[in-house]
Amino acid sequence: MSTTPGQPWATTGTAAPGVHITAASFSYHHADRERPAFKGVNLDIAAGEKVLLAGASGAGKSTLLHAIAGVLQDDDAGSFGDLRLDGVPPEQARGRAGLMQQDPESQVVLSRIGDDVAFACENLAVPRAEIPDRCRQALQAVGLGHLPLDHSTAALSGGQKQRLALAGILAMQPGLLLLDEPTANLDPEGTDHVRDSVVTAAQATGATLIVVEHRLGTWLNQVDTLIVLEPGGGIRHRLPASALHHDEALRAELVDAGLWVPDHDVVEALPTWLSPGQLPDDSADQALLTGTELAVSRQSSARSWRKTPPPQPVLSGVDITLDSGVATGITGRNGAGKSTLLLTLGGLLAPHGGVITASARLKGEHGARLPSSPHHWRSADLTSRIGTVFQEPEHQFVRHTVTQELRLSAEQAKVPGTKESLFTDQEVTERVAALLDRLRLTHLAEANPFTLSGGEKRRLSVGTALAAGPEVLMLDEPTFGQDAHTFGELIGLLREHLDSGGTVVAVTHDRDFLRGLDADVFALTAAEAEEPPNADTSTAGATATPLLSAVRDTSWLGRRGPLAKLIALSFITIALISTIDPVSAAVVAVACFALLPVANIRLGTFLRRIWIFAAAAVMAVWGAAVAAEESGRVLLDLGLTTISTGSLEMGLSLGARAFAIVLPSVLIFSTTDPTDLADALAQQLKLPTRFVLGALAAMRLLGLMAAHWTTLGHARRARGLGTRFLSQAFGLLVQAIRIATRLAVTMESRGFGAGERTWSRSACFTRADGVVVLGGLAIAASATATAIFAGTWNLVWM
């Protein structure tokens, strides 16, 4: 089944009727803010009505959307008034509304795209036979139909994850679609495709649709109603969407309010400006940074000791020159490797191939000894020369208030090549105040950066880069979430940066941004982009935890059922923990290494996964040998304690047993997909569904944290903080809490915990699974029998 814009959306089963939304004097106030997110909102949205929700950046649009979805999480906040979905509070309408949030990463629940799309259908007890068609149709509608259902979600770019989140909501066929800037990270073609698919689905199912979007022209002709929020207040306007085309007074009012009104050219309305690249000035067109025959990848190519094939580059054959006074826009399809190229040029990722050369001007008067490639510079040398803004701003936040974030950047800035501060204390204060004003963040100066809206976070992240005064700015989607006024302020600041001789490099799909800076367009071509596309987000492609990530395992052991492997593992573990002797442990260890071909795991790969456990086993041997009771000949007298032949034998037995218990676990979990394991535990062992799926989401979160650790290291290097372990560890903890909170919102909005559920894939026990169980039993019996025959078997409870 395929769905393309313009074709009928084929509803599967019985679609939920549209939801009727009412609100009476509804207000919401965040705990740490002086003014409410919104106040006195009165709504009456008919079932099946399609609404475009607009307003200035920070007007409370996302908060209102979360309130309607029933997933507001701030326990210390206050909500007043009445809000109803079909006459009941939103919290009691679980599964009736599908919510798409701004952050793509926190909307991915499971490790394979097919399972992730099916998650909501399962929670809503959609019959198993209907789920595959719903999933394929939804993936086709959002432009991911070419990917296999077992494709890893970790290998998706930010834009692709946004499409995946939308597919999961469309597959629900809910009565209410709540979409928060659903096309913000998409390329222009993807924007039109996704918009048309959403509208087609809403029309076919009769669902109510509310879309938050700054660029009104994207959705205006596809919706019935336009609602404009007043920042900190209620509804400023509610009117038919078509009225905006012919009501000139209304258009002028909304332009003054900072909205992106169709046919109003925001760039044309900006002050006249001639880019330095067009001026006959010696300071212009001087190369600051040059890339030659670049190949880029998230994974390092310098791993010659590995037996596995080296990672393939995301891009190759890239030649790029960044000139003084010139802006460059890196464009291309989602997943093409734009962000990877940006981070490589910024010195945060090592080039996979080719050469990056910094000019003498960029190095500075005192930087003659710096290596040519920024990747080899110290963090302090980097931050005053190259400022980088990540696709996810939160990765770079390290302080408790907005003001402190900006001050940190200005205080970390040094005269290039020296330890001398670039700005005096007075200059730092003035610089911070000016940026707060220009970025329209003055009223949020003491707010926690993590509590800002998406657009406010984006402006702050750009401000932290500007505050350090670097010559080169690397920006990833800098205009996300901006209204027309804040867009203009960003353009103004970046124009001033170009006028001063700096350069701007931006990954962007925003054509207005490119026009506003008169940017050279560096379009990634099919010849440069490798297939299949690798991850393009700040977390994707980083080192992941091998036992917690999605497994596309075609080995004999990988194709066996998780329950059978758990039973086999239980037999082996019981045999090992029942005795303390080295012989049974040695038998199990030999068996595990012998089974590597069955699991299609290379010896080097296996050794890398178990070395930490081997080191722990050696420490256990020493600790037990020192602590055990003396018996036999004394081998080493340490004064306070001794090591004898008996205590050493005990230590060896305990260490070998501990190590042997780990080996089959690594073998089993390296060939077992977490989702398959959850299916088996819930369907075959009948464990509680909430426990199993909660644990599964936690496992994915742990895998994400391994990738986020790498990303946070890059972000702190960009901020001039180097690799401070405790600071980075605290940042990781903050990220874990925030992602877990958003992941919980995603799961709730997709019907998790709504009641009885179905499973898209059945878990069953096969004859081959029986072979696995018998194999585990045979290893356990062989280990025990060999130890008894050798006379070392020592039953622990005797």
Which residues are covered by each model-predicted region?
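Transmembrane alpha-helix interface motif
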Residues: 540-584, 588-593, 597, 707-798
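Conserved ABC ATPase "signature" region
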Residues: 130-147, 423-444
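The feature captures the beta-strand-to-loop junction immediately N-terminal to the Walker
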Residues: 54-56, 331-333
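ABC ATPase C-loop
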Residues: 169-170, 465-466
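Helix-to-loop junction immediately C-terminal to a conserved catalytic motif
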Residues: 69, 346
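Conserved beta-strand-loop-alpha-helix hinge in the C-terminal portion
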Residues: 233-258, 515-516, 525-541
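Catalytic Walker B motif of ABC-type/P-loop ATPase nucleotide-binding domains
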Residues: 177-181, 473-477
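Conserved ABC ATPase signature
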Residues: 152-156, 160, 448-452, 456
